[in-house]
Amino acid sequence: MGAEWELGAEAGGSLLLCAALLAAGCALGLRLGRGQGAADRGALIWLCYDALVHFALEGPFVYLSLVGNVANSDGLIASLWKEYGKADARWVYFDPTIVSVEILTVALDGSLALFLIYAIVKEKYYRHFLQITLCVCELYGCWMTFLPEWLTRSPNLNTSNWLYCWLYLFFFNGVWVLIPGLLLWQSWLELKKMHQKETSSVKKFQ
């Protein structure tokens, strides 16, 4: 088996940490989603995982980047970002665009995810306003993470290895495009349904 197909200890540890956060997100989402429909249970699982990633992984990344950089840091979280940095070197050495986007992501997106969890569980009227806002912010974060790099012919991206290209870059980032897109579609359908219901009610009294 070629070297590009080998899964090292660093990669295994990082993937186990991500899997642990996913398991925690699933457990929290299912617990909070008791009595909810399947779509909302799925949304809660995603939002719990989303919040955990923003606060437990990206929050420490921002701190490490502001006091120094990931390359010169030690610890479990630093090791995870060093591993991801093999696919995208901007996460290892201080990159102003990445750090700026991540500050916004941690502070705004993480907080919005928590507020949205509350809004879904408590069936608040502002649920879809928060959902649309969060999804747009997540998509904007992905856009600003990769478009500047693509415009400069991706000098920091390593696509020569299947793990780095398809798992780290494509899958882990693609999830933050696919699921916010699905949640935007859910909000669109719910707002359309509410508008049709309100319109039909008004017509009955005319």
From Swiss-Prot:
GO MF, one example: cholestenol delta-isomerase activity
Subunit-level organization: Homodimer.
Membrane topology annotation: Multi-pass membrane protein
A Pfam family annotated for this UniProt entry: EBP
InterPro entries cross-referenced by the UniProt entry: EBP, EXPERA
Name of the encoding gene: EBPL
Chief place of localization: endoplasmic reticulum
Keywords, sorted A to Z: Endoplasmic reticulum, Membrane, Transmembrane, Transmembrane helix
Domain EXPERA: 39-184
Family from the record: Belongs to the EBP family.
Tissue expression per record: Widely expressed with highest levels in liver, lung and kidney.
Keyword Transmembrane helix in record: yes
Cell compartments where the protein resides: Endoplasmic reticulum membrane
BP-aspect Gene Ontology terms: sterol metabolic process
Membrane-spanning ranges: 10-30, 42-62, 101-121, 165-185
GO cellular component: endoplasmic reticulum; endoplasmic reticulum membrane
Protein name stated in the entry: Emopamil-binding protein-like
Function summary: Does not possess sterol isomerase activity and does not bind sigma ligands.
Domain of life per record: Eukaryota
